């Protein structure tokens, strides 16, 4: 970029980092993963995954961004020009996530507007299929869901207004407002949920431990997967935010605060959602196991049904919940957008304003492709492929490259300089050997699952995304090489 921005305060950076990590997945995925993988006993692999993978990799990204202060593509180019293509592949995959992420936010935005009057009617599932997210019925592939189409345009316009500013004035200021509000809203929902009849049933269902589950390797893999995507590690988002840091930042201390805030929030959400599910089970005599779900089914079908049962109180809780999802998702989308923006602006010497405008228009057009009658199904297919095939292996490659081609010992000194919490040689060993091994195993299992479940439509999407990302990565790598541009 022509100019290099900085966060104007440590608090601004902290809120921005929390906003980057807390997202939709914390709300609609964590509680389900927790419940289906041993309940209360899941805390053990969850905490170990944080200590072994989450914190060490975040510390690495903080250190790299703070030290080098350049775009992710330029960083890998400077390490070795052959590695630049890896950087472009990663930031492009993350950009694709930003594209469909905004589609999910558009669904939430529609539900937020309808939550004051329960506009989804008596059948939230039908409302979602016909007016919001469509279904897996390919008969709707040629149709456009107008509310989603309009909501996408509105959200990308709002996104442009925020991201178009200097990072501190745009991302920083909105994070300082939305993050405290996010925790306040979720705390209110949690407190209220504890007053509902049946909340004990929900909490017991969620927290009852299954100690035998700890012997299942899949439980441990689920914990590590949750941490990877909950903390957004290895996706160049954290690295890019860290490039805007000043010299006085306590890097490692900040990592621990971000991880703590992320975990507290998703645990709060899990407790609140299961308390509400317990209430629904008691009042409707439906077994709670039949209510438990994740993703779109939980947020856009099950919870609206519960809000209907709540009556007038539901008209307060529902808007608050959908607003919290909107806040969490919007700040995460800002972070998802930043790696490609930084790399493109650095590559072509664009101003931030030009980069944001060009990429936001492209992203908006991409999001609109998801507004057809198979919107939710398409999002699911793309999300699974991008994360399990694309991003996971690229995170492993980062760990391998950075621990072998960057002076990690020198980086450790930089990290320890202003931090009360220090890292030692075990941190380097973890990054160099344990993390890559874990990530490669997870990637192999994920690819195996993709192959097992593939059909002609999914295969077509996978091939299209692969060629698109590879083609653009080669194009960006060869066009106007970074080392020739001054």
Please annotate each region the language model reported.
Residues 5, 34-60, 86, 147, ...:
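Extracellular loop-to-transmembrane helix junctions
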Residues 12-49, 201, 237-242, 253-256, ...:
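Transmembrane helix-boundary motif of multi-pass solute transporters/channels
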Residues 57, 98-124, 183-207, 279, ...:
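Hydrophobic alpha-helical segments and their helix-loop junctions in multi-pass secondary transporters
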Residues 12-18, 88-91, 119-164, 232-238, ...:
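Transmembrane alpha-helical segments of multi-pass small-molecule transport proteins
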Residues 2-11, 172, 176-330, 334, ...:
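Membrane-embedded translocation segments of transport machinery
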Residues 2-5, 33-37, 70-89, 102-168, ...:
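Inter-helical loop and helix-membrane interface segments of multi-pass membrane transporters/permeases
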Residues 348-360, 386-461:
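C-terminal membrane-solvent junction of multi-pass transporters and transport-like membrane proteins
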Residues 1-28, 57-62, 66-78, 85, ...:
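Membrane-interface "cap" regions at the ends of multi-pass membrane proteins
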